[in-house]
Amino acid sequence: MSMTPKTPILDTVNSPADLKNLPLDRLKSLADEVRAETIDAVSVTGGHLGAGLGVVELTTALHHVFDTPTDTLIWDVGHQCYPHKILTGRRDRIRTLRQPGGLSGFTKRSESEYDPFGAAHASTSISAALGFAVGRDLKDENRNVIAVIGDGSMSAGMAYEAMNNAGHIGGRLIVILNDNDMSIAPPVGAMSHYFARLVSSQRYRSIRKLGKGVAKALRVEEAARRAEEYMRGMAMGGTLFEEMGFRYVGPIDGHDLDQLVPVLRNVRDGDNGPVLIHVVTQKGKGYAPAEASDDKYHGVAKFNVITGEQQKSKAAAPSYTKVFAQQLIREAEADSRVVGVTAAMPGGTGLDLFGERFPDRMFDVGIAEQHAVTFAAGLAADGMKPFAAIYSTFLQRGYDQVVHDVAIQKLPVRFAIDRAGLVGADGATHAGSFDIGYLGALPGMVLMAAADELELSRMVKTAALIDDGPSAFRYPRGNGTGIEIPDQIEPLEIGKGRIVREGSRIAILSLGTRLEESLKAADALAAQGFSTTVADARFAKPLDEDLILRLAREHEVLITVEEGAVGGFGAFVLHMLADKGALDRGLRIRTLTLPDVFQDQEAPFDMYETAGLNARHIAAKALEAMGKDDAAAERVAAALIAG
């Protein structure tokens, strides 16, 4: 249920220029209207809600004080950018967020001049902003560069690498630390209030205890001075940033425009050099359901604004993520060496369920994929059985560690690659397109792709038994097929696929969940008189050479199908067939992959339709290879639609 809010001030805002002369009282009212508009828009489209609501006042203040787009404003991750989009001329399209042909759910350079740098992954903003700042100085220009980064993103080493470099360069750069988890310090109105709360805190008492120990070794006066400096630095959060060459300002209340606006003006008009402003905010601010449960309202489906109830359809089958978690729990019950590692995505990867059962064996390392991989490598080297559950798109961030710390040392880290393939509304930045190619290139890697929930369970079991090197299994976002999973799961034979359907003229070799579409294509082809074999490869590495050579030998046409980019499974098959001389007799072979483009957001089925990987495309490709005309393909397509 959505009731369009009344927004008289926002109705007059077409660009940030319209905010410049607003007095503070009207600026506060504008922020309230932006918050109401954000809530209403996301209730219609779904998307990231809590983070955006937490930065409404900050966004309003930034566009009031700074001269965007002349001043460069970069949002880390970008999922909090909905208020920013509303204020930068995109309000008329805000209810197309994450829809086909609509606004991206993140910042996007091609969408607006107010998005100077795109994002969707964490911790990139300071590096990018420093690049803009250095470019500005080399061109002798006079403009501000601002990066807004959340405290969660500060858990990634890249943010500190950028700050270290920025402090060394010493140029003018403004970094705003949006502390929405209160992980560094609480908001303050006055220092006296702050220290009143501080001295009653466990943190202060721990530091005071430490101070007593120090006093035994130092003169009382010197000990007191050093303890005070240490306490203030730890509590206020500024010492680390100042040591890196930043002037530290804060913490300040990120929802109080009376504080935000003058501080931003002072920093804007202040001295050169890097500055960090520590702003404390609350996720979901101003919307009671989101304030009460910020984790459930981080990313939401369409919802009723009045009740907060999300409109989630009841699943007919469990999600692949849940199936993975349940099987991992079974493995951990049988083997105390099984542990789970995730990089700030316990809920998304299912490791929250594992952690409920085994709290001492689940490790959330924060937004730190590089560390996650090498941490898992260390666990493996010490005899544990780590499962690193990471989204395909985020595993890219730790690829050097996969190569250097895992593969070269032949350490048995098991990579559970969630969100493999196309993911829908989050678009290109979150697609799991490349892992088959970049993992399949590594010597000794065992790489599997699940066709359904039972196959995924068997792959978890198989990975748990691999102790002589790394392994990985990939599976998509969303629900499974509904296949029954028995209590006793049998492992797979390494490098062996399976024949799912026997035929004689055309062979379709599927890797992953395109198996269902491949079977539909085979039915349609058979109805037109083309007997079709369907095989599930299971393994992208090592390949089942015997199976593939048999398919090549006994059929006129061989089609490979995968939910991955060019240079993946199909390329591996072609390389093997060429090496074995199987192409010499004139086999007609085609590889169906994701297209060589970055696809924008659509519903998952529609994304695969655009990609040409649904049943009608598979059948059409087979008919093309058989030399049949378009009319035959049209008949098959019509049969599939009718079916």
UniProtKB/Swiss-Prot annotation:
The enzyme's E.C. designation: 2.2.1.7
Keyword Magnesium appears in the UniProt entry: yes
Pfam family name, one: DXP_synthase_N
Needed co-factor(s): Mg(2+); thiamine diphosphate
Cofactor note text: Binds 1 Mg(2+) ion per subunit. Binds 1 thiamine pyrophosphate per subunit.
Transmembrane segments annotated in the record for this chain: none
CDD domains tied to this protein: TPP_DXS (cd02007), TPP_PYR_DXS_TK_like (cd07033)
Quaternary structure, from the entry: Homodimer.
Protein's name according to its UniProt entry: 1-deoxy-D-xylulose-5-phosphate synthase
Species: Maricaulis maris (strain MCS10)
Lineage: Bacteria, Pseudomonadati, Pseudomonadota, Alphaproteobacteria, Maricaulales
